[in-house]
From Swiss-Prot:
Organism encoding this protein: Cutibacterium acnes (strain DSM 16379 / KPA171202) (Propionibacterium acnes)
GO cellular component, as recorded: plasma membrane
Record protein name field: Putative membrane protein insertion efficiency factor
Subcellular location field: Cell membrane
Keywords: Cell membrane, Membrane
Amino acid sequence: MRRFRPLTWLAIGFVKGWRALISPLYGDVCKYQPSCSTYGLRALQVHGVFRATPMIIWRILRCNPWSHGGYDPVPGTPEARQWRELHPETARSKNEPIHDLTDDNPRDHEPALRKSIPGYTDPGSTHTGTPSHTRGEN
């Protein structure tokens, strides 16, 4: 049995009000599927207000002119699990290394490791710009 969660229901009411009153003024402008308001509503229903709020904020921040958009289900839902099973390449964590260095000789990866050091400039590189850590100050 689900318990009554007044903050969650208040947030759900806000999202439903937004969808009824504000969304029609803008039309279908969201780059993501489901729309940001549908995402927020689903996140609140599944996770509650405290866990859903950071998800909703992050989703709204990602919905900008520079994003590519696409299908973005709420984490922890059956839709998200099904999407991960059908598209395992999209389930990779941003912190997960693309290549596992543990099985290889580390000396094979030294140039790649050096390039990951902030301020490192490859001696053979033609890049003459200001290092990013100086923020334009010389």
